[in-house]
């Protein structure tokens, strides 16, 4: 398979090409990889392995945030990024997401558990039901849902 380093170099340089920028020199790319992998405490040995081959669940999640750091998207959608993570990996991944947040980008984090929000403070919390946003609020909404569940919202929802 393709190594993480080669995959990321190709992705980063294609993105730079699209923006009319020169490809990164090898030394610049390696420096960038070291800086970005430090954000999620990604073991440098993983970058020489094939993409996600033999990665643990936590390593895959860290790798997703590492890729996000390398590509610096304007919009990132993280679907249950907390799924299957132990508390240490959850903290590392969430801290990485928080460090990458700027005024120039947006991250949509989909989760069913409030514990992720102990580390990522959302600007807004939306509750989706049957494909629609039925309720919005701040972090306190997530805390209430953790305590009381969703029934109180769904019972009040009229299609």
Language-model-detected regions and their locations in the chain:
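ABC-family P-loop ATPase nucleotide-binding domains
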Residues: 1-74
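Walker B catalytic motif
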Residues: 80-81, 88
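Conserved D-loop-proximal element of ABC-family nucleotide-binding domains
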Residues: 86-91, 136
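Conserved beta-strand-loop-alpha-helix hinge in the C-terminal portion
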Residues: 119, 124, 128, 132-155
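Helical segment within the ABC ATPase nucleotide-binding domain
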Residues: 90-103
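Hydrophobic residue in the Walker B motif beta-strand
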Residues: 76-78
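Helical "lid/switch" subdomain of P-loop NTPase nucleotide-binding domains
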Residues: 89, 113-116, 120-121
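Conserved H-loop
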Residues: 104-112
């Amino acid at each position: 398979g393709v190594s993480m380093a080669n995959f990321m170099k190709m992705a980063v340089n294609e993105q730079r090409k699209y923006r009319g920028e020169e490809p990164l020199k090898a030394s610049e790319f390696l420096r960038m990889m070291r800086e970005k992998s430090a954000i999620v405490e990604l073991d440098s040995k993983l970058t020489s392995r094939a993409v996600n081959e033999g990665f643990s669940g936590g390593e895959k999640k860290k790798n997703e945030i590492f890729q996000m750091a390398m590509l610096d998207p304007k919009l990132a959608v993280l679907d249950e990024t907390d799924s299957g993570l132990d508390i240490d990996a959850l903290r590392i991944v969430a801290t990485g997401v928080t460090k990458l947040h700027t005024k120039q980008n947006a991250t949509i984090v989909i989760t069913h558990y409030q514990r992720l929000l102990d580390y990522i403070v959302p600007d807004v919390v939306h509750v989706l039901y049957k494909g629609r946003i039925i309720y919005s609020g701040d972090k306190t909404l997530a805390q209430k849902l953790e305590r009381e569940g969703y029934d109180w919202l769904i019972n009040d929802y009229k299609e």
